[in-house]
C-alpha cells in the first residue's frame, strides 16, 4: 500500500485553524507519507454526474464522497478527511492482509443502526470495494427529479455495498472477501467517544459546510477563536 494520504479540499480558501491542527498531526506522526490534495477542478474532471451536481450545489462533502473512492481506487493509499486528528501511526493496520480496510462508525453504545467509516480508510490500487462504490455512484444523481438533493451519506452507502459481502452491524473486527472492518474503538468517530489504548485518532467533525442554528454558530465561532489563539501561541 503506497504511503500516500489523499485529502479533498474543494471551494478554495485557506484551511481553518481546526484543520491546520489536524494536518499538523499527519506531518508530525507520518513524515514518511506524502499528502495528495484533490481539488474541485480534479473532481469535476472525473466527469461523474453525481459529483458535478454536488459541486454545482456547493455541497463539497457529497462530491468528496465519490472522489475519495476514486483516489484510493486509482492510486492506492489512505484517505482521510481534513478533520482527522491522529494520535499515533497505523502501521499495524496498513500491514493487514486486506485490499480495503475501514472501521465501524458506532458513535454511541446504544446505536444499532450504524454505518462504516468514510472519514478514514485505506486500500490498494484497484481494490474491489472502491470499484463497487464507484459503480454505485455511477448510477446515482445528487439532484432528484424534483430538484431536491439526495442527501444519503456515504457511511450508509458503504454499509449497503458491504452487506452484499456479508457485513452486519456488529462492532467487532470483520474480515470479508473484499474488505476488512475494524472496531470503532480504533478510530474515535466523535469527541465524546471514549479513547482506547489502541485508538489511532479521532474524527473531529469540523463540518464547516453545515448550516447551524444561530446559537450553535455563535458557540462554534467562540470555540474557533479560542483554537486560533491557542494554535498561534503554540506555533510561534
Predicted regions located by residue number:
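Glycosyltransferase-associated regions of secretory-pathway enzymes
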Residues: 1-64, 80-236
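Small-residue hinge/turn detector
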Residues: 65-77
Amino acid at each position: 500500500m503506497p504511503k500516500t494520504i489523499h485529502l479533498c479540499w474543494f471551494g478554495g480558501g485557506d484551511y481553518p485553524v481546526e484543520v491546520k491542527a489536524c494536518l499538523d498531526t499527519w506531518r508530525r506522526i507520518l513524515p514518511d507519507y506524502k499528502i495528495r490534495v484533490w481539488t474541485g477542478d480534479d473532481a469535476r474532471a472525473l466527469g461523474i454526474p453525481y459529483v458535478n451536481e454536488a459541486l454545482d450545489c456547493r455541497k463539497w462533502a457529497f462530491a468528496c464522497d465519490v472522489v475519495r473512492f476514486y483516489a484510493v481506487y486509482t492510486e492506492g493509499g489512505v484517505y482521510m478527511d481534513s478533520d482527522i486528528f491522529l494520535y499515533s501511526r497505523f502501521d499495524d493496520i496498513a500491514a493487514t492482509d486486506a485490499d480495503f480496510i475501514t472501521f465501524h462508525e458506532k458513535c454511541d453504545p446504544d446505536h444499532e443502526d450504524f454505518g462504516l467509516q468514510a472519514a478514514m480508510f485505506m486500500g490498494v490500487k484497484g481494490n474491489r470495494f472502491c470499484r463497487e462504490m464507484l459503480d454505485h455512484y455511477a448510477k446515482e444523481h445528487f439532484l432528484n427529479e424534483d430538484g431536491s438533493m439526495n442527501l444519503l451519506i456515504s457511511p450508509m452507502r458503504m454499509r449497503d455495498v458491504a452487506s452484499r459481502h456479508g457485513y452486519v452491524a456488529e462492532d467487532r473486527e470483520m474480515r470479508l472477501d473484499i474488505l476488512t472492518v475494524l472496531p470503532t474503538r480504533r478510530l474515535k468517530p466523535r469527541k465524546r467517544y471514549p479513547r482506547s489504548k489502541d485508538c489511532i485518532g479521532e474524527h473531529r467533525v469540523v463540518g464547516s459546510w453545515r448550516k447551524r442554528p444561530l446559537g450553535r454558530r455563535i458557540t462554534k465561532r467562540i470555540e474557533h477563536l479560542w483554537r486560533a489563539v491557542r494554535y498561534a501561541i503554540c506555533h510561534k
